[in-house]
Each structure stands twice: as C-alpha cells, then as structure tokens.
Curated annotation (Swiss-Prot):
Pfam families: Methyltransf_5 (PF01795). This is Ribosomal RNA small subunit methyltransferase H. It is an enzyme of class 2 (transferase). Belongs to the methyltransferase superfamily. RsmH family. It catalyses: cytidine(1402) in 16S rRNA + S-adenosyl-L-methionine = N(4)-methylcytidine(1402) in 16S rRNA + S-adenosyl-L-homocysteine + H(+). It comes from Aliivibrio salmonicida (strain LFI1238) (Vibrio salmonicida (strain LFI1238)). The lineage of its organism: Bacteria, Pseudomonadati, Pseudomonadota, Gammaproteobacteria, Vibrionales. Specifically methylates the N4 position of cytidine in position 1402 (C1402) of 16S rRNA.
Length: 316
C-alpha cells in the first residue's frame, strides 16, 4: 500500500477494548478497510480464537488477502449481510463481538479515481464497490430536482438543498455544458450556486458529497440491517462496538442501543396476562459506558478523527 493511501484507524484501542476480547472468542470486523482494527483484534486473540472480517471494496479485499494468519478469514460483501454470513458458517449464537467502523476510509477519500472527495478531481463515482451498482454521475443523468433535493436534505442535512439541486439540473440540461462526470465539476458547481454569504467553515460541497455517497451506497439501510443482524447472532455477553463519523450514523446507533436496552414498550392501561408479558420478551442489550470521542492528541495526529463517536453495548 502506497504512503499516499495509508489509513490511520480511528479510536483503535478504545474500540477494541470495548469488545472485551476473549482469547478463544469468535469476532467479526464488519468493515475491514485496510485492516487496522482486524490486526489489533488478532493481536489479542489466542491460538483458538477466530476473526471473520467483511468488506465490499475490492481494494480492501486485496489488502486482506495479504494476511496469512490461519485464525483470519475475509468475506467479500456488504456488512448488511452479516447475519447471513454467520448463518452460513453455522455460528449463530456464538459471536463474541462485532466491530463496525462506519463511513468512508482515508484510502477511499485519498484515491481520486474513487470519486469520494471534492478536494481531488476524479470520476464522479462514490461506490464502495465499483463493480456493482450505479455511480453518482449515472444517477444524476435522470434524477429530477425533487429527488436530488430530498437526497441532499435527508442525507446531507443541508439547508441549501433546493438551491444546489436546481443548479445541478440547470447545468445538466444545458446542452452547451460538458456532461457532469467529474468530482471537480460538481464541487465547482456547488460553490458557484452556494449563497454569497455562505459562512460555514466546511466547503460548500461537503454536505452534498456526503449525501450522494450515503444515497448511492444505501449506507443507512446497511447500518440498520447490520445492527439488527448482529443482535441475532451474538452469544450472551457479546459486545457491539460501533464508530460513527456524522450525526446521521450516530443517531441510528444511539437509538438502536437505547431501544434494545429498554425492551418492548407496552402502553399504560393495556391489560396483559403473565404469559403475554413473557412473550413480549425483555431488554436484549445494555450500553457499556458513555459515548467515547477521540482525544485531543488523536485529533492532532489524525484530523479526520475529529467527528468520530464510539458507542459500545453488550448482548444480554
């Protein structure tokens, strides 16, 4: 791996500590990336421990194949398939920990050819797996103003969503313009249509690029499916350790842990028999500590860690 595409794992020790590694345990790293968390898990496992890592990025799979440790296996696919992979392995109810490091990795951002960054010109792609699905440039060929506005507002939480969407469609529909196929084009277009008094510290294109990436990769659906899948495969006492990088992700994780730690909520005044109450079940998880954020030192070393949040929970 070239120096340009090196990846510094965020909240590395805190997230692995949160898994409370058992030497002979079975663990899943749902987001292999460049293997920082996976290698740390392996360093804490005994000779009978096992680690199954997952990633849908072919470049991540290539990196994973350089690991020859017999305790390690890599699965090429989205982490939303976690439950299915565990079922195929016959390990339901035996998983001692699941780690999810959400969002886009530094190597993906730094590689202009992947199209994730507005800071570097490249193909307007943004797919986590470039071998499947639709690149952003293809989606923008036919998406209307309402659809684009909804995506930017829903996944980018940008108050200028309508203005940006109108600018994109106006540019696209002008036959004198070059096709919108490059990240540099999109970043400039957004800067041009942003209000002249735009005062945010971030680049005007930040939220739109985030929104398009989340949408094109169905990231929030992936997270929801993975969290619920993990719940179904844990052994008693199994740990969930999740690192989020923006408010949409963190809210999902926070609400999931809260919901599963409260158990079924029955409205007051509804008469239930003892058997009916038992059938509803009880809380399935408990939160471990409070949300953890990177230290000042970590942010100084790796500025991309500044927005990260780690949440840990345990299966009951």
């Amino acid at each position: 791996m070239s120096e340009q595409f090196q990846h510094v794992s965020v909240l590395l020790h805190e997230s692995i500590d949160g898994l409370a590694i058992k030497p002979d345990g079975i663990y899943i790293d749902g987001t292999f990336g460049r293997g920082g968390h996976s290698r740390q898990i392996l360093s804490r496992l005994g000779e009978n421990g096992r680690l199954y890592s997952i990633d849908r990025d072919p470049q991540a799979i290539a990196e994973a194949k350089t690991i020859t440790d017999p305790r390690f296996n890599i699965i090429h696919g989205p982490f939303s398939g976690l439950k299915g992979y565990v079922e195929e392995l016959g390990l339901v109810g035996q998983i001692d920990g699941v780690l999810l490091d959400l969002g886009v990795s530094s190597p993906q951002l730094d590689d202009a050819d992947r199209g994730f960054s507005f800071m570097k010109d490249g193909p307007l792609d943004m797919r986590m797996d470039p071998t499947s699905g639709m690149p952003v440039s293809q989606w923008l060929l036919t998406a209307d103003v309402e659809d684009i506005t909804w995506v930017i507002r829903e996944f980018g939480e940008d108050k200028h969503a309508w203005r940006i969407a109108k600018g994109i469609v106006a540019y696209r529909d002008n036959e004198e313009n070059e096709p919108l196929t490059r990240t540099g084009q999109l970043a400039k277009l957004i800067s041009d249509v942003a209000p002249k008094n735009f005062k945010e510290k971030k680049h005007p294109a930040t939220r739109t690029f985030q929104a398009f990436r989340i949408y094109i990769n169905s990231e929030l659906d992936e997270i929801d499916t993975a969290l619920n899948g993990a719940l179904d495969v844990f052994a008693e006492g199994g740990r969930l350790s999740v690192i989020s990088f923006h408010s949409l992700e963190d809210r999902m994780v926070k609400h999931f842990i809260r919901k599963e730690s409260r158990g079924p909520q029955v409205p007051h005044g509804i008469p239930l028999t003892e058997n009916q109450i038992k059938a509803l079940g009880s809380a399935k998880m408990k939160p471990i500590g409070k949300a953890i954020k990177p230290t000042v030192n970590e942010v100084d070393v790796n500025v991309r860690s500044r927005s990260s949040v780690l949440r840990i929970a345990e299966r009951l």
